[in-house]
Amino acid sequence: YIGNPNLNNESSLEANAFVAFKNERISAKLSSNYFHISDYIVGKVIGGLVPMTIGGKGVKQYGSLDYATIFNADLNTQVQLFSFLKWNSQFTYARGKDYRKENLPFMSPLSYRSALQFYKNKLSAEFSVFGNSRYRDFAAVYGETETTDYTIFNVNAGYQFSFNGMKVLTKIGVENIFDRIYTTYADWNKIPRPGRNFYLNLNLNF
């Protein structure tokens, strides 16, 4: 990226709306917002220049658009299945357009995250899944390309115990259980995210 100190500051108009529901076991909230941004700053591809970074596909310079519009929406839910078992989910979506109705870069496709959380005395465990749909509304004008969909599974378990007056929390887990090769819409040059990995955490509270 090449900077540009002569750009005007962005200014925006924003509208928000949400609806929510909650009882003893279930809570849900659907929210959305809309932005109309004047002098929107974005990186524009410059032709004829060779990138210095190995693997780079072009050089961009920051410039401003007359205006851009961005719409975001998200749904959050929580269900208390049992006293020891909770289910959380989140769905998010974003869409952006410039003043020429071209797609804006770095707008998240439909993404989701869901987790089952178990708590019983000093034992805890979680099974989670997250992912993105295919990135079809990419901003080709601004140098973006399509990104495939993916779904990633994780699991962990923890236990808390006392030792010589200290509280010790241990947690062991596996991320990306099925060793899926994936990249997100925001990753530079489509460099893959980490594959299957194992971790062990040990927290000591004196």
Enumerate the predicted regions with their spans.
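Extracytoplasmic loops and strand-loop junctions of Gram-negative outer membrane beta-barrel proteins
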Residues: 1-4, 13, 54-62, 96-99, ...
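Outer membrane beta-barrel strand-and-loop segments of large Gram-negative receptors
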Residues: 2-8, 14, 23, 27-86
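Conserved C-terminal beta-signal and adjacent last beta-strands/turns
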Residues: 13, 73, 77-93, 103-206
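Small/polar-residue-rich segments within soluble enzyme cores
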Residues: 18
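Generic beta-strand structural signal
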Residues: 21-22, 118
